[in-house]
Amino acid sequence: MNIALGVLVLLNSFIAGTEPRDGSHVRTLDKGLRSVIDEGLARSASFRGLVARLDGSDVIVYVEPECPMSSRLFGRLTLLGAGGDRRYVNVRISCMLPVTQQIAALGHELRHAVEIADAPSVIDDASLAAEYRRVGFASRAARSGAGYESRAAIDAAHQVWVELAHTAE
C-alpha cells in the first residue's frame, strides 16, 4: 500500500498541471486514448452516462494504454488509493484492439470505477476485495488471481458496443 500511495503522490503532482479544462474525472495523457474517450462520448449514451457519474463522484480515473496486454484481457482497473477527498484508480486498455473495442473495454472498466464510486468504503485492496465479494465475483482472466468481475461491467461493455454499432464512425 505504501508503494501505491507513493505512486499516488507522484501521479497527483504530475497530473495537477494537466487537469482537463472541462474538469472531467476521466483523464489521460495519451493522445490515442484521448481520441478513444472523445469518440466514446460522441457515439455512446451509456459511455457518456458512466463518465457523468464519475464526474459527479470522488473518484479520479487515469487511463493509460498497455502494450502488450495479456491476450485474455482487454483492460484492467487498479485502485491506487485514497487521499484527501479523492480516490484514485488507474485503468489500462489494450492498445492492440481496434478503436471500437477499446471504447467498449473502457466502458467496462469505467463501470468498475462507478462501482467503486458507489462504495465509499473502498479505499484500499482489502476493502475493494470485500466490495467485489458483495457485488461481483472472482475473475479467472486475471494473471495474479486477484482480479474481480461484475455482471454490471459486462453488461456496460455490451451496451456500449451495441450503441457503437448503431452510430456512424
What are these regions (language model features)?
Residues 2-16:
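Hydrophobic h-region of N-terminal signal peptides that target proteins for export
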Residues 7-11, 114, 164:
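Structural signature of transmembrane alpha-helix termini at the membrane-water interface
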Residues 14-40:
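Short N-terminal segments immediately surrounding and downstream of signal-peptide cleavage
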Residues 42-83, 100, 126-169:
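Metalloprotease/metallohydrolase-associated module, dominated by Zn2+-dependent proteases
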Residues 81-92:
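Short, charge-rich amphipathic alpha-helices with coiled-coil/heptad character
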Residues 90-106:
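Short pre-active-site segment immediately N-terminal to the catalytic Zn-binding motif
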Residues 108, 112, 149-150:
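Histidine-centered active-site/metal-ligand motif
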Residues 110-126:
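Catalytic Zn2+-binding segment of zinc metalloproteases
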